[in-house]
Amino acid sequence: MDLYHTPAGALDKLVAHSLHPAPEFTAAVRRALGSLDNVLRKNGAGGLQRPRVIRIIKGGAHARGTALRGGTDVELVIFLDCLRSFGDQKTCHTEILGAIQALLESWGCNPGPGLTFEFSGPKASGILQFRLASVDQENWIDVSLVPAFDALGQLHSEVKPTPNVYSSLLSSHCQAGEHSACFTELRKNFVNIRPVKLKNLILLVKHWYRQVQTQVVRATLPPSYALELLTIFAWEQGCRKDAFSLAQGLRTVLALIQRNKHLCIFWTENYGFEDPAVGEFLRRQLKRPRPVILDPADPTWDLGNGTAWCWDVLAKEAEYSFNQQCFKEASGALVQPWEGPGLPCAGILDLGHPIQQGAKHALEDNNGHLAVQPMKESLQPSNPARGLPETATKISAMPDPTVTETHKSLKKSVHPKTVSETVVNPSSHVWITQSTASSNTPPGHSSMSTAGSQMGPDLSQIPSKELDSFIQDHLRPSSQFQQQVRQAIDTILCCLREKCVDKVLRVSKGGSFGRGTDLRGKCDVELVIFYKTLGDFKGQNSHQTEILCDMQAQLQRWCQNPAPGLSLQFIEQKSNALHLQLVPTNLSNRVDLSVLPAFDAVGPLKSGAKPLPETYSSLLSSGCQAGEHAACFAELRRNFINTRPAKLRSLMLLVKHWYRQVAARFEGGETAGAALPPAYALELLTVFAWEQGCGEQKFSMAEGLRTVLRLVQQHQSLCIYWTVNYSVQDPAIRAHLLRQLRKARPLILDPADPTWNMDQGNWKLLAQEAAALESQVCLQSRDGNLVPPWDVMPALLHQTPAQNLDKFICEFLQPDRHFLTQVKRAVDTICSFLKENCFRNSTIKVLKVVKGGSSAKGTALQGRSDADLVVFLSCFRQFSEQGSHRAEIIAEIQAQLEACQQKQRFDVKFEISKRKNPRVLSFTLTSKTLLGQSVDFDVLPAFDALGQLKSGSRPDPRVYTDLIQSYSNAGEFSTCFTELQRDFISSRPTKLKSLIRLVKHWYQQCNKTVKGKGSLPPQHGLELLTVYAWERGSQNPQFNMAEGFRTVLELIGQYRQLCVYWTINYGAEDETIGDFLKMQLQKPRPVILDPADPTGNLGHNARWDLLAKEAAAYTSALCCMDKDGNPIKPWPVKAAV
């Protein structure tokens, strides 16, 4: 079913036979959705008010008639009478969704014959998601169930919604596409009234898109619906016939994708420029970075979203496809794309025409001229329109020509030579522009700068190896300018000390200038002046006004030119500070200066000393707003940052430069009202990333940047705070922190002021920009691959309250279930292939292939986990033979693995290690859709000592007597007992396996802390210790997670007494085994015997003291403390059996 190898003439057959959904699955889904529809209508949405279901509309690819075989989607939009406005939809969904989920749980027990039901994690709030799949999992459909406000009501066919529907939508201040569900009916009608063959072309495009998805793991691709709209546009502009060549249509769509940076497409079938509010909004939308593809049903939803999606990945693949078999005629000639307004021309890289929807709907300047950007620099006009950039072109407004005339005109002039030849097409519903951006402007973005600031070169275009020099050359302020600023600040302070009425105690310099994170072009300085008259937090506000008036008067009188080449300008004032600007005569830089009178809460502190606890208890009891008294702690804030290594502060400059470019791109646009998070939040995020993921003086700048960008994308999970200045041991601080930790994420607390949480601002927009930057060269290594981020989680275990540990495990440690299912399916395929094909022409036989490691036990952690594939071979007849002929055996298994890789189809990315080691064979299975999710496998040939063992039965004692007589090193033949090791853990309750995950995560954090000091005990030893703690202390399948964790830490602290073993598989009944066990148990503590292999002592010869030290530190952390600050009590478990 490979598209590229299908001849152009066979594409219709490919669509008919391979892309249309399986009829029996479609019928089963239709029956299931009909049944669910009845249940929902009958029961309503539950709850106290029992809202009435007005109607239910089906959307998504399934309803639009563009569903692909394999996997597709459907949207069930439930219009309820209790939702009377767009605002209601935001606030009322929690109770409604809870009631609907209860209905779904009942209905999902039996969704219909041939179907399975499983809930999925919601991609957005206000939505319930589940999956219906065929029993063989070959076909599935993701169902999104959305309660919605019936904005449209009962629409008549071909009747536009009233304009007030859209003006009401825009006045609701919604996010882009937030209420798209309300317009599902329009979206569905827009697509499924199209000719059958056009929908076949859509299937072909989506099949190509799916093939790209399987090859790209990390990139965030545009939604497939964007490609449906692009396909419709291509057909409208270039064909409009019911019968056409699929190859030609596909070639046209891919050419548009290749030229995506010039796309600006919209339709006016449902909304237009007639209404002033809608018209003004559309004008702003059409100025967004390319590509712009507006949903024909909801103008707030830009499917192109040039700043969020990796269109460049699709464009690269589109370009690669043009010479493939699917675009070759039988004669060998290449298929040419359609020609038409706004479409690429054969052999010409630029798009054919800049086009607008119609003269009366076009964007007009003050003189009534249409503003369209030129296709080439040579087309720039000599007299640009007033108020427009120099690159804008003036085109005289002209009456609407008829459709027929427009098409004739366009056919004659595909690539216009003069602007006057450009025509206006009333039927095309599109405006396409060509930008002439500078080399420093990234694809899809306009180059914007704030007056008085220097943006510098575009970060996305800087190779990763040049980032250090880029920071030095373009981001660091000049030492001469910094000296000027210091001189000006000293002059200002001297003036205030001498001239002001009130006595100044001391001064603190803060802001980015004080912290050493100021960027070239524009920086901020915070001068906090501590006055004797401001004696406490509560009294600070009462005297501030008169002090500020005095300050302003003195500065205006005495300090107009505080330093040579710098002038002082007063700007808009706020109630608690004086705001000024230091402006150099050449206007090359700008310094925003805030002067704040404040209460000296901290006093002069010695280096490294903490403020007194009463400082913070006084702050919390003052009843202040969040961050209201942040200025009082400016010195602590400055010291927290400027004591960091120079390279870490360079990384902060890089992050802030990216942040500044994002802010400039959206300045004055539709998102301008939704301010970005404060830049200081990104400084703290950068410190957190470095502390948790690196901690070294020298590091890769690209890796650090990518880590910060990844954390920005995880903003909904961020929980970050430090206790360098305040402590959880203080009851008032602890109670305050626990309240803060109950808030929605992100949570980033100022390390100097615990009341200041930097959750404000449009984190979603910043996350979209972070995702867009991840595909650029600044984050690519020399071989073109993305540099790896540091291993940093968005929240820390020791900062998680004890009562939240189950949630912490579920959110951050539990692997994705769908990925685990994919891995299991892939491993089953590999095992079967190896068993059937290895040593086919040899006397050696593969007896069985067994999966081991954390993945098999059910204790794998989210992210990168490990597993073993143990291949039991007939050529090994005893333990001592296991090492013989290893190189030849590994070579044969590798050859078959490579054959399996080529011949079999996998839902995951299957990579065999290229490491040249004749004794080791490894491969990795990686998710194609989830970032950072993979399992590393080691393939291990082994002697089948156990044979076919029945479940629950003990091995023959002779197995262990042979083992004892054969082994030389502890655990030498442990691979032979993989099945027993796996079953010992996998049979345990689910919650116990969650506790094992928690202990393993803690262990991995400890490994980072003690790196270089010695080898910690093996991780498997801690798994066994956790099982022992539960067996001896609880045995309840539903135990308290904090108590279980605390017990394991307690046992680690008692490592000198540890003696743990089991007799589930071996015992003292046999004399040889009994004597051996006595010898093992008499060895120095700790002793933890492998329950499957008595030769394996997992407590021997490791730095338990380092682990015990870390365990002791954790017992006083929030995760081991109840809400009153008392330590969680461990279970009563003895350290020895």
Swiss-Prot record:
Give the E.C. number(s). 2.7.7.84
The cofactor(s) it depends on are:
Mg(2+)
* Function according to Swiss-Prot or TrEMBL: Interferon-induced, dsRNA-activated antiviral enzyme which plays a critical role in cellular innate antiviral response. In addition, it may also play a role in other cellular processes such as apoptosis, cell growth, differentiation and gene regulation. Synthesizes preferentially dimers of 2'-5'-oligoadenylates (2-5A) from ATP which then bind to the inactive monomeric form of ribonuclease L (RNase L) leading to its dimerization and subsequent activation.
Q: Name its species.
A: Rattus norvegicus (Rat)
What does the record give under GO molecular function?
A: 2'-5'-oligoadenylate synthetase activity; ATP binding; double-stranded RNA binding; metal ion binding
Q: Where is this site: Interaction with dsRNA?
A: Q154, D242
What is its subcellular localisation? Cytoplasm; Nucleus
* Ranges of biased composition (kind: Polar residues): 434-453
Give the source lineage, highest ranks first.
Eukaryota, Metazoa, Chordata, Craniata, Vertebrata
**Region ranges (OAS domain 1):** 6-341
Q: What is this protein called?
A: 2'-5'-oligoadenylate synthase 3
